[in-house]
């Protein structure tokens, strides 16, 4: 279906009390306006015209990679004026969909229904019925058809009783919309050019206006303050949690789970409370994620357990691994099958071989570790000299004792043993024992100093 979209995003967002443009505030980890852009892109919009005003530099920096045409509304003179700034780019025969950057949850299904419902030469309008319509423009009907929209400040007492309200979302043909926009005036209580006045213009020409309801009322709720943003965040997360539960993922408490990206799960996945998923995450069969974990852009294979309060970003974890608690896997970390990393272990740009373990208080950076190797508590790969990074290579079946410092670049061959407390600066041959611990001394009869009175 051939259509282009106009997204209105020029508002300042005064009630957000922020230096950031309102539409850049995030919902589920990405700016509100990006949710709208992504929905349009997914539906195949030919063009996406983004009307901006306040915080233009911030907007363009944050959305630099988005496929939008930037349209400046230098003065905020109303919604009609905003759409009119983009109208020179409208094709006469294309459908124009008007959306809002602070209404992030509108669904593809609702938009498709609206596009399908547009009558020839007329307007398809998205409306919703509210128990308390205060503050919204009212839908005025005459013997059934929609004939006008009256804003709250311009409504008379009878019109204020109407519960069907305008969401602002509409579809019209480009040539018709340009003509109606050209005829707008600002003779109203707010002194603005209302987009809603095109409804009356279409009716006066004898063109039909078709009202469509959204799949869910939450879709058309806008954000004017942080409380409303928090409400939409919880609504979005509840919907994501419901989908995962229906797909067989066991969320121990759906109300305490945040999905801020995409999650692919195998069978019998279990996710405990307060877990945050960001970016693209893949979990294999029988994976268990403990409470308080943060997973970002990572892949975790079958039968792996991630214990509580672990952070995994840009890493791959093999089958039957154990991670955590309190582990940090940074970008480039790779755990091969049946490997273990435990509490307060940090791994960055390092591969831990099959069956190897680093169970306590360890930093492994820029390292390659073979199979069945044990890394003792307190071991550090000293990979950075203040200017450059260097690699540590540890072979198969190596035992590294506690509190060892491995000063890269250094290689430890298969079967070697590094004694506890060693500072290693030279390569170790296969099967060697290396220890650099200072000689132990015992002093008999020694007494502790006594504080002077």
Curated annotation (Swiss-Prot):
UDP-N-acetyl-alpha-D-glucosamine binds at residues 8-11, 22, 73, 78-79, 100-102, 137, 151, 166, 224, 330, 348, 363, 374. Residues 227-247 are annotated as: Linker. The keyword Nucleotidyltransferase applies. Its main location: cytoplasm. NCBIfam families: glmU, PRK09451.1. The active site is at residue 360. The keyword Cell wall biogenesis/degradation applies. It comes from the Bacteria. Catalyzes the last two sequential reactions in the de novo biosynthetic pathway for UDP-N-acetylglucosamine (UDP-GlcNAc). The C-terminal domain catalyzes the transfer of acetyl group from acetyl coenzyme A to glucosamine-1-phosphate (GlcN-1-P) to produce N-acetylglucosamine-1-phosphate (GlcNAc-1-P), which is converted into UDP-GlcNAc by the transfer of uridine 5-monophosphate (from uridine 5-triphosphate), a reaction catalyzed by the N-terminal domain. CDD domains: GT2_GlmU_N_bac, LbH_GlmU_C. This is Bifunctional protein GlmU. It holds the Pfam family Hexapep. Gene3D superfamilies: Hexapeptide repeat proteins, Spore Coat Polysaccharide Biosynthesis Protein SpsA, Chain A. Acetyl-CoA binds at residues 377, 383-384, 402, 420, 437. Its cofactor is Mg(2+). It comes from Vibrio vulnificus (strain YJ016). It catalyses: alpha-D-glucosamine 1-phosphate + acetyl-CoA = N-acetyl-alpha-D-glucosamine 1-phosphate + CoA + H(+); N-acetyl-alpha-D-glucosamine 1-phosphate + UTP + H(+) = UDP-N-acetyl-alpha-D-glucosamine + diphosphate. Mg(2+) binds at residues 102, 224. Binds 1 Mg(2+) ion per subunit. Its EC number is 2.7.7.23, 2.3.1.157. In the N-terminal section; belongs to the N-acetylglucosamine-1-phosphate uridyltransferase family. In the C-terminal section; belongs to the transferase hexapeptide repeat family. The gene is glmU. PROSITE patterns: HEXAPEP_TRANSFERASES. GO terms for biological process: cell morphogenesis; cell wall organization; lipid A biosynthetic process; peptidoglycan biosynthetic process; regulation of cell shape; UDP-N-acetylglucosamine biosynthetic process.
